[in-house]
Amino acid sequence: TFDNYLVGKTQGEYLVDALDLENADGPFNLEIITGDPGDNNVNFFYGGAMDVLQPYIDEGKLVVPSGQIAKEEVATANWATDAAQSRFENILSSNYADGTNLDAVLASNDSTALGVENALAANYTGEYPIITGQDCDIANVANIVAGKQAMSVFKDTRALASQVVEMVDAIISGEEVPVNDTETYDNGTGIIPSYLCEPVAVTIDNYK
């Protein structure tokens, strides 16, 4: 599988760099959106990103005007674009209607990012925020090209397939199966040894 904690960490680190949080005074306004609360991957996406961003929130360099920070508050049922759009329309009308700038949106994936982008198009007049995503959906890559989304995280299934072939060959040959993670995935009966492939950050500079 892919290293989903690293997906979130990559998104968080992108925002740190894009906002120059190490050097800039701030504060910067941030809003957060993740996926379905029943999807275990959300724990990794959200956890990886917040491990990076929480210190800046605690410091006051990042501010969340909506006050919605907890995973349960920022979840999106079924990862649905329309649900993401509806929530962000409410956030924008309640916190940004006076022209306050939204500086960044941590969106765990592209379907939620698209909902954010749709809400911004209809309900926002400030400077356009930096928005993250994941999956490199066609609509979102188009938005990256158009300057409406800063980045997405690409998980190359070819790399996944190649690793699966290598692992199956090892099993058939009676050799040791290559794994690089023996801590992350617990199915309730024990830890499942895994091989975590690395995702890639995609921006306007490398999307081709």
Segment roles from a protein language model:
Residues 1-208:
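A residue-level marker of the well-folded mature domains of exported/periplasmic proteins
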